[in-house]
């Protein structure tokens, strides 16, 4: 859900501190504004500590049932407006120097590591991209607007007197400084690779800072502003089938096709290692070039493969020292694709052990039952143990197994919410951000979340559902939901078959089942979801013998041992977990509620505040 926040028109004056009104702004996403007649207050551009501007930086798009104040503090993105002006001025100066000493055509300079601890991509800097000023005119920021408070970062639109707008992205402090630094370095390098090597339409990055030591005083990415509308506006996952059996497919494919084409281009390069992409200077320890066969001298050795920034390796790992965590995040040899699974299992087990040690000394920042942590250790060690047996990597039963195991880019957010149709470029789709993009085998890559579906498959309501015509309307709606989710995923897989058919066997049901324990671990969002990893392992146990006979797996005997007592306990715990989810309507969002809904629920007396400031749902 998108809501609008504040806009700061900034008027710089030499003789005195500048004053700037703060007000809500209608966003480029075209949704409703909070107020048509905003109240104005004023702030001095030179006063970074002016309390009048605090609301501009505070998180306002939702509230949490528990620890609301702490969660919002993590998402406060206060930065220096003066510092931002200095950074943009520096980019203009670099652009002028570049114009004076323009390199030969086709030569792309490496990233520039600047004295102010920012990194600029000088090939993206020009009067066309940054705007131009009159002689002796000083660049200044004229207006700013907070246009999106995302799940992991805040997005600001910045206008200047050079008649150009920028996007400033600031990550929330929900991870360690090291995690944010690695993530930003990798994201910018991956966007650069997508632009220069793959020819994808992405926002051009002008500059970034990997930590808060730069003039902006926050980690940031400063990039091109693209005016347009989200592809999400065209996506209706519950679109009814058209009477002609075709029109609805065209509507759905209007969204699926551009995203599938993005995916196929991302998959087109085979890398020399598994991990994530960086600029060569940001990870100089890489063994050789990121990929083979580069003929453009400007791109040779521009990038390297380093530690994976996939979210699962960094999420909720504060109990581990950085040097310990770094032992598990790669990069990994391309000859050992399943080491990614093994490392993730070992990392999660080590994290659970560290949390258990803290819990036993009453030093845990997030208390949890010790029995749950012990169960997590067992589950994740099981995942690590089975990793080398999950796939028979020499099997000819899975077509093109060699291609499925090669290192390829994996974008975790191929989603219509992450694609903008540029109104100035004939509605061309632009893939906006590349957070947590990694390099791993396609056989381990799950379908994008907007089409992913693991429930019962229904391809034809009347043929697959016995007595469908005689069901009640409520029952029909349930089956229609399953059918439409099945249909959408099938359309995505059909697009993969069209755009990159040698990888299509990765969506075969046995292959999906084999990677399911790993996928459950990757997508785990809370402590109790270790049960979903366990459930996937136990399901594999039931079919392992059949898979072994068909040479899908490399071991004849299932590698893990489960006692009847363990199986019974798992079943009981899993049922209790599902019952708790049913009772907790906001469990899927970890207790986060959109602000409008939160305020309405409080007014209606449905959410009750306790003495600790937390909220519970009135029973």
UniProtKB/Swiss-Prot annotation:
Entry similarity comment: Belongs to the AIM9 family.
PANTHER family: ALTERED INHERITANCE OF MITOCHONDRIA PROTEIN 9, MITOCHONDRIAL
Location of the transit peptide in the chain: 1-34
Region (Disordered): 95-115
Name of encoding gene: AIM9
Localization, UniProt: Mitochondrion
SUPFAM superfamilies: Protein kinase-like (PK-like) (SSF56112)
Top-level taxon of origin: Eukaryota
InterPro entries, per database record: Kinase-like_dom_sf (IPR011009), Mito_inheritance_9 (IPR051035)
Keywords tagged on the record: Mitochondrion, Transit peptide
The keyword Transferase is assigned to this record: no
Cellular component GO terms held in the UniProt record: mitochondrion
Name of the featured protein: Altered inheritance of mitochondria protein 9, mitochondrial
Keyword Nucleotide-binding: no
Cysteine disulfide partners in this protein: none
Principal location class: mitochondrion
Organism of derivation: Lachancea thermotolerans (strain ATCC 56472 / CBS 6340 / NRRL Y-8284) (Yeast)
């Amino acid at each position: 859900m998108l809501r609008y926040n504040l806009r700061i028109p900034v008027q710089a004056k030499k003789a005195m501190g500048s004053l700037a009104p703060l007000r809500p702004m209608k966003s480029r996403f075209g949704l409703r504004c909070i107020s048509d007649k905003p109240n104005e207050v004023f702030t001095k551009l030179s006063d970074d500590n002016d309390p009048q501007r605090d609301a501009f930086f505070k998180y306002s798009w939702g509230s949490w049932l528990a620890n609301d104040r702490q969660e919002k503090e993590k998402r406060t993105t206060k930065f220096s407006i003066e510092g931002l002006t200095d950074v943009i001025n520096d980019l203009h100066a670099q652009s002028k120097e570049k114009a004076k000493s323009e390199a030969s055509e086709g030569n792309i300079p490496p990233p520039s590591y600047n004295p102010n601890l920012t990194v600029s991509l000088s090939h993206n800097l020009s009067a066309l991209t940054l705007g131009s000023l009159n002689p002796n005119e000083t660049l200044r920021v004229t207006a700013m607007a907070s246009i999106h408070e995302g799940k992991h970062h805040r997005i600001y639109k910045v206008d200047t007197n050079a008649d150009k707008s920028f996007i400033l992205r600031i990550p929330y402090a929900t991870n360690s400084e090291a995690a944010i630094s690695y993530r930003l370095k990798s994201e910018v390098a991956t966007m650069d690779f997508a632009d220069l090597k793959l020819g994808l339409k992405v926002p051009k990055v002008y500059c970034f800072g990997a930590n808060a030591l730069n003039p902006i005083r926050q980690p940031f990415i400063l990039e091109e502003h693209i005016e347009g509308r989200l592809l999400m506006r065209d996506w209706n996952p519950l679109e009814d089938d058209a009477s002609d059996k075709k029109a609805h497919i065209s509507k759905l494919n209007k969204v699926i096709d551009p995203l599938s084409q993005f995916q196929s281009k991302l998959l087109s390069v085979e890398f020399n290692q598994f991990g994530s992409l960086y600029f060569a200077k940001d990870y100089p320890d890489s063994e050789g070039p990121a990929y083979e066969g580069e003929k453009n001298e400007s791109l040779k050795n521009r990038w390297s493969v380093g530690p994976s920034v996939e979210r699962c390796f960094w999420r909720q790992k504060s109990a581990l020292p950085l040097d310990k965590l770094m032992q598990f995040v790669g990069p990994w040899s391309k000859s050992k694709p399943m080491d990614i699974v093994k490392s993730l299992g070992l990392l999660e087990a080590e994290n659970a052990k560290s949390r258990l040690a803290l819990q036993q000394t009453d030093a845990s920042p997030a208390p949890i039952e010790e029995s749950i942590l012990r169960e997590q250790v067992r589950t994740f060690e099981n995942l690590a143990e089975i990793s080398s047996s999950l796939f028979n990597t020499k099997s000819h039963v899975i077509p093109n197994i060699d291609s499925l195991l090669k290192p390829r880019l994996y974008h975790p957010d191929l989603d219509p919410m992450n694609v903008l149709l540029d109104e100035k470029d004939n509605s061309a789709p632009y893939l906006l951000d590349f957070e947590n993009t990694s390099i791993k085998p396609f056989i381990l890559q799950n379908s994008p979340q907007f089409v992913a579906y693991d429930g019962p498959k229904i391809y034809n309501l009347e043929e697959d559902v016995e007595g469908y015509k005689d069901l009640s309307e409520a029952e029909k709606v349930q089956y229609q939901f399953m059918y439409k989710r099945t249909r959408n995923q099938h359309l995505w897989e059909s697009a993969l078959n069209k755009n990159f058919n040698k990888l299509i066997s990765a969506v075969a049901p046995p292959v999906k089942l084999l990677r399911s324990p790993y996928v459950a671990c990757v997508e785990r969002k809370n402590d109790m979801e270790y049960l979903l990893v366990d459930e996937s392992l136990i399901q594999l146990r039931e079919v392992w013998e059949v898979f072994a006979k068909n040479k899908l797996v490399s071991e004849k005997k299932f590698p893990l041992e489960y006692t009847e007592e363990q199986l019974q306990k798992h079943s009981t715990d899993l049922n209790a977990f599902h019952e708790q989810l049913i009772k907790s309507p906001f469990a899927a969002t970890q207790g986060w509620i959109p602000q409008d809904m939160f305020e309405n629920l409080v007014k209606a007396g449905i959410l009750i505040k306790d003495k600790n400031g937390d909220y519970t749902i009135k029973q």
